[in-house]
Swiss-Prot record:
Family classification: Belongs to the peptidase M36 family.
Native source species: Trichophyton rubrum
Stimuli inducing this protein: Expression is strongly increased during growth on protein-rich medium. Expressed at even higher levels when keratin is present in the protein-rich medium.
Designated name of the protein: Extracellular metalloproteinase 3
Record key words, sorted: Glycoprotein, Hydrolase, Metal-binding, Metalloprotease, Protease, Secreted, Signal, Virulence, Zinc, Zymogen
Encoding gene, per UniProt annotation: MEP3
Length: 633
């Protein structure tokens, strides 16, 4: 049975694998003692959105028989009738049905390298939107190819090496002609990962004129650079582009649950190997905004169902740094920060779950699965400050191949109102609905947690992962945690009890479910058991509070991450719409598969503490509890 599950936070009234730590960014990017940022040219692009385009295009005539490339070409010609340009050979129709065509402006047969025009064609064959950075000044009258009054490309290479202090030896460099007008590859160099290249191009300068330059390409590992060296003076560098772009996000870092636990910091390149295209690319396109292979984040103040044209912060240099203050009001005044935080938390959780096995074949949320199994084209659509509700959040999980959708609401429980995106636990809780629904019953079936008890466990898994991730080095098994306390402006949170290993603080037992009739109440019982399980495994294996787990032979080497791994593996093992007993058994089976039951008795003791021990029985109206352990424990 196929289905879609919408889950909310509240009821409606010996190989060792280690992942790198996140890098906290400095204020100025400086590599090899050179500030590359100082060479960047200002932005020149203009963009006409779909609404404005619809009005403008009414006055233009296009043939219905044109293909999308021809239609786009006619638009460029009509917009710049006196300009010369070429079609870039990378046009395609995206998964949303929009055709994308790119053009490069030329002068005297040479590219103006930073003069581009992009046209987006809708499903109806009409221009959807477009943007351009075409040069509108005076083109030099003299063709440089006639007198060839420009410097040797070797001098340009040496100029780039000197200006940027590159580790490239170019004394013996010799140019070899390659495909393309005035294009060369340099032989006899050392220090670069591949042979440096150069080709002659024009470049728009900041003062509105064109400069004839050598575009020198050097791949030195940490940087893959395009250096625009003046073709008449090799000591002058006009612009530098680095293919190895570091993305930076100013956010509450991973592990900080909400603003009471710390301050926003700038974090650079936080992705792991789980995101080989980084967070701002899907392997096919790079996005200078909060969009990538794993997620697309935007605001949604109207609460509508569309998202692709909603607002997102834009940053061509991938520096997503925006102000936030606890006294700022309304939340829309800091929407850039909110969207960035939501994008960060969602991607960070994607990468962690990937390390535990929620990958392409398991039905995770990605556009491009890279031929690794599963169905792609299903990133998570995550809406910040969604206007369709307040004081809650939800996640819709269709089967694998269709995007999940998270809606994060503002909370009116405090003055000023609070944004749920800033409480990581709520985001993690919601995304976990996607995890559990894709794993339980298989990625193609999203209807395997729709019974009262199984749906309750769906809520409990969300609380468990949210709590496990926020643990701090100072915490012990006596540490208690709430759920949703900051957003709800209530230190007790939004659950009946705190998550605690103390039965006086949290008295929930397995038989408590007999009197509960709401999924979040039942979920609190399940999450309480998993919280006990986590601390039992931490006592057995030690705890680590690093952002990423360390594995040996596929087994997390600390109790906290081991508990997350076993619980997740259990989701994939259990039947469709399981009960507590079956889910407990699935976790035991997960440990058997992963560690050959090395933690069997530890797991049994944790569940037995709250009455889900050996001999506990399920009955919808009269569950039987047990504190017993099986033989051998």
């Amino acid at each position: 049975m196929h289905g879609l599950l919408l889950a909310g936070l509240l009821a409606l009234p010996m190989n060792v694998l280690a992942y790198p730590a996140e890098q906290h960014a400095s204020n100025v990017l400086s590599r090899r003692g050179v500030d590359i940022e100082s060479f960047r040219l200002p932005l020149k692009a203009k963009y006409m959105d779909s609404e404005a385009t619809a009005q403008k295009i009414q006055a233009m005539s296009f043939s219905k028989d044109d293909d999308y490339v021809s239609t786009a070409t006619k638009l460029v010609k009509s917009t710049f009738p006196k300009s010369t340009f070429r079609v870039v050979d990378d046009h395609y129709i995206g998964t949303n049905g929009i055709g994308h065509v790119h053009f490069k402006q030329t002068a005297h047969g040479l590219d103006i390298d930073n003069s581009d025009f992009n046209v987006n064609i809708g499903r109806d064959g009409k221009v959807f939107s477009f943007g351009n950075s075409f040069f509108t000044g005076e083109i030099p009258k003299e063709n440089p190819m006639v007198k060839r009054a420009f410097s040797d490309p070797v001098k340009a290479l040496k100029g780039a090496v000197k200006a940027l202090n590159l580790p490239v030896k170019s004394d013996n460099a010799k140019p070899k002609t390659i495909a393309g007008k005035e294009s060369f590859e340099f032989m006899g160099t050392t220090g670069a990962l591949s042979a440096p290249k150069a080709n002659l191009v024009y470049l728009q300068k900041e003062d509105g004129t064109l400069a004839l330059t050598w575009k020198v390409e050097t791949d030195v590992g940490d940087n893959w650079l395009l250096t625009y060296v003046d073709a008449h003076n090799s000591e002058t560098v006009h612009n530098v582009v680095d293919y190895v772009a570091s993305a930076e996000y100013k956010v509450f870092a991973w592990g900080l649950n909400d603003p009471t636990e710390g301050n926003p910091t700038s974090i650079r390149d936080p992705w792991t190997d789980a995101s080989p295209y980084t967070w701002n690319s899907d392997g096919m396109s790079k996005y200078p905004t909060t969009r990538g292979n794993n997620a697309i984040a935007q605001d949604n103040p109207t609460g509508g169902s569309t998202y692709i044209n909603n607002y997102r912060p834009q940053s061509p240099n991938l520096i997503f740094s925006y102000p936030w203050s606890p006294t700022a009001t309304p939340p829309s005044s800091y929407k850039d920060f909110s969207i960035t935080q939501l994008f960060y938390t969602t991607n960070r959780y994607h990468d962690l779950l990937y390390s535990f096995g929620f990958n392409e074949a398991a039905g995770n949320f990605q556009v491009n699965n890279g031929n690794k199994g599963g169905k792609g084209n299903d990133f998570a659509i995550v809406n910040a400050q969604d206007g369709s509700g307040t004081n809650n959040a939800n996640f819709a999980t269709p089967p694998d191949g269709s995007p999940g959708r998270m809606r994060m609401y503002n909370w009116t429980t405090a003055r000023p109102n609070r944004d749920g995106c800033l409480e990581a636990g709520i985001v993690i809780h919601e995304y976990t609905h996607g995890l559990s629904n894709r794993l339980c019953g298989g990625p193609a079936n999203s209807a395997c947690l729709n019974a009262l008890e199984s749906g309750g466990m769906g809520e409990g898994w969300g609380d468990f992962y949210a709590t496990a991730i926020r643990l701090k080095p100072r915490d012990t098994k006596n540490t208690n945690y709430s759920m949703g306390a900051w957003a709800a402006n209530n230190p007790k949170g939004i659950r009946a009890y705190l998550y605690s290993t103390n039965l006086q603080t949290n008295p929930y037992m397995y038989t408590s479910v007999n009197s509960l009739r709401e999924v979040h109440q039942i979920g609190t019982v399940w999450a309480s058991m998993l919280y006990d399980l986590m601390w039992a495994l931490i006592e057995a294996h030690g705890g680590t509070y690093s952002a990423n787990p360390v594995f040996r032979n596929g087994v997390p080497q600390d109790g906290r991450h081991l508990s997350m791994k076993l619980v997740m593996d259990g989701m994939a093992l259990q039947p469709c719409n399981p009960n507590f007993v079956q889910a407990r058994d699935a976790i035991l089976d997960a440990d058997r598969a992963l560690t050959n039951s090395a933690n069997k008795c530890t797991i049994w003791k944790a569940f037995a503490k709250r009455g889900l021990g050996y001999g506990a029985k399920y009955d919808a109206r009269n569950r039987t509890g047990s504190n017993k352990l099986p033989p051998g424990c």
